[in-house]
């Protein structure tokens, strides 16, 4: 009888132990840093670019334009990325159409680069570019459902969506500055998951 009781207790203990053990399904990927930011950009197409670093979530000084400290530059409606003719980095861009929040995995290949001053990775053409231009109000609106997947100058991955482009209030006929508001998810560990 003692033997039967010990076997029953051992069986119950074994079952309880198996039930209480859970497989660790945690993911070791560091979550992407998600932010909303805005930068002021010169409206004048002859003005210097405004450079931005996703890693530092900050505007980068023009004196660093020949370094990998920035990921994209912006002037008027023209983006440049830090690679090929525009900089020494390894940045690339995929213009993506779809739902920004649903995009969770950056591609390993297929990135576009700035190949000439008129062949930029992010198209800024009036009819083919990333924005819609309203000739009555002179407003630039980002195309709905379009965002960018960016490999940064130092090989990290970002998804970025432009939320709005507005003029800084101005006197006279021509604006001086545009304010770009955008949100992005930056993967600091170099993985491609957002």
Predicted regions: what is each one?
Residues 8-11, 155:
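Hydrophobic alpha-helical context, especially transmembrane and signal-peptide helices
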Residues 1-9:
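Bacterial N-terminal signal peptides that target proteins for export
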Residues 22-194:
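Surface-exposed, beta-sheet-biased, low-hydrophobicity segments with strongly acidic/polar composition
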Residues 17-20:
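C-terminal motif of bacterial Sec signal peptides marking the signal peptidase cleavage site
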